[in-house]
Amino acid sequence: MHPAEVFDYEDIQLVPNKCIIDSRSEADTSIEFGPRRFKIPVVPANMETVINEPLAVWLAEHDYFYVMHRFQPEDRRGFIERMQAKSLFASISVGVKPEEVTFIDELATAGLTPEYITIDIAHGHSDAVIRMIHHIKQQLPNSFVIAGNVGTPEAVRELENAGADATKVGIGPGKACITKLKTGFGTGGWQLAAVRLCAKAARKPIVADGGIRYNGDIAKSIRFGASMVMIGSMLAGHEQSPGSLLTIDGRTFKQYWGSASEKQKGAYRNVEGKQMLVPYRGDIDQTLTAMEEDLQSAISYAGGRNLLDIRTVDYVIVKSSILNGDNY
C-alpha cells in the first residue's frame, strides 16, 4: 500500500464545484440501501448505548435505517414480530456462535424473514462469518445480509463472493474502541483510506463504520465509496438513547461504551471497548435533521443535486493530523 494512500477524515478536504441549485433544500440526500430508500446515508451504531427498540421504531417510522444490537438475543424474534406487526422493517444483528445458527433456523421454520440481517463481529474476515453468510442465504434468502467488520479489499471480495449483500468496514476506529491499542491491529488513523480501498474492490454497498467526528465526515465517506455511514458516539447521548442521565458539576451526560467493553460483557474477558460519558444532546430528531441539512450543503458544494454527486468531486490531502500534532 503506497503511503500517500493512507489518510483519515481530518486529512482530507473536498474541493468545491460550481453550484447548480438555488437552495440547498433542493438537494436530495436519500440513498437506496437494500430493498428500501432512506432519508440520509446514516445509521446509528448497533450498540446497546445507541439503539433500543423504541428508537428503532421511531427511526423506521421516519425513513431512517437502523440495526438493532444483538445483546438481548432472547428478544430478537419478538422484536422482528413486533416490528412487522407495525408494518415496519426489521433489521437485526447476529453473531457466529452455534446458537446463532440455531436462531436463523428457528426464524426460517417460523416463516419470519427480517428485511436486514447484520453479521457483526469484531474481525469479520473469517471462515465463521463466511459460513454464517452461506447459512443465512440458504435459510432466509430474502434477507439483505450486511457482513463485517473488515478492513481490507480481500475481505470485501471474500464476503461478497460468499453472498453478503453489503460489507461493513472499520476495525477499531471508533471513539469507544481500543482494539488498535490492545492488539496493534485496525483501521484507526486510516479509516477513510480503508473505506476507499474497500469500496474500489466492492461490487456491492459498503458501510463505513467508525471514526466519524463531524457531519462533514459523512460527505467524505460518501465521496470515497460508502453507501451508508454507521455512527456511534455522535448518535449517543440523546433523549431517546438508551442509558441513564448523569449530572456532574451541573453538566448532564449519558453513558456510552464500546461493543466489547467490560460493562457489556459483565466480566473481564477480551475487552476491546471502553466506557465513557457523552454530553447530553437533546432530541435525536434535531441531530439527524442537522446531518441532513449539512449533507444538502455538501451536495451543493459538490455542484450536484443528489447524494452520489459527491462521489465525483476532487479532494486534497492536507495531513492536518500531522500539522496539528494530533496523534490519535
UniProtKB/Swiss-Prot annotation:
Known function: Catalyzes the irreversible NADPH-dependent deamination of GMP to IMP. It functions in the conversion of nucleobase, nucleoside and nucleotide derivatives of G to A nucleotides, and in maintaining the intracellular balance of A and G nucleotides.
Alphabetized GO MF terms: GMP reductase activity
Active site per UniProt: 177
Binding-site residues, NADP(+): 206-229
E.C. code: 1.7.1.7
Name by which UniProt lists this protein: GMP reductase
Annotated GO CC locations: cytosol; GMP reductase complex
